[in-house]
């Protein structure tokens, strides 16, 4: 009788730097115990589709490859959200996939949405319709927090956050130089739907003049007054860092379309602020830059010593 344990691992939600390194850690730890690792492809879809999409991962075919040093997700990911009324159905499909593969546990590497779903799978929270299926099946679900927003609780820094800060900080440094050359106030719009950690860290590290975050409602007059103070000090340029999900003094999001499941999709607040500043203060021209997906794609370990890890050659 084969008593070898089988564990699954999947990445869910938006990708970020460090995912492949986490997968490698799971593979290596399992290999030391003689366990088998099933990499589920394309997030939860890989486990709920027929046939199940997976790849057996080993130290030989994965850990020793170039992938653990690169950003993105080797397994692929999924970022479309789940309606609460469909969570029970999805839980059932998820459970069937786990049973079909014979998994003893599954590791979910995801952000706040994925962690909430993990909690629902295990506890039946969030909706009265949610079946307590996986707990009844005795499934062990392990959540590893990853998000460039750094908005998952009970962890100081989530996987992907530091690399995203580095990208945004580099952008602030670059914008400071070009803003000085053209005597402009440049706006950097960064990700951050409900949390301003990314904007705050980048603004502090890059010494930006203004930082706007979702947690603190902003007033356009305060921004104008700061720009006037910068001008009065004799400096001819400024940099503003803004989270995509900031709110006005009434607590309202100013920009935000909806996706297919009714969640707000943010973006465009930089252009809005630029127009508002230009209407009220003519001393600075404004321009807008966005880091967007670049925050997700900085390599976990960058090439060094003249060697490119992507092609494994000099």
For each of these PLM feature ranges, what is it?
Residues 154-165, 296-303:
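Short beta-strand elements at the ligand-binding edges of bilobed clamshell
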Residues 97, 105-111, 116-120, 129-133, ...:
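Accessory alpha-helical/coil subdomains and C-terminal extensions
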Residues 264-314:
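C-terminal non-catalytic interaction/assembly regions of soluble proteins
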Residues 6-14, 73-78, 105-109, 186-189, ...:
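Short glycine-rich or small-residue beta-strand-to-loop segments that form or flank ligand, phosphate
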Residues 12-15, 40-46, 79-80, 111-114, ...:
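Short, ordered loop/turn segments at secondary-structure junctions
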Residues 2-51:
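N-terminal phosphate-binding or glycine-rich loops at protein starts, especially the Walker A/P-loop
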Residues 47-108, 113-115, 144, 157-170:
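Glycine-rich oxoanion-binding loops at beta->alpha junctions
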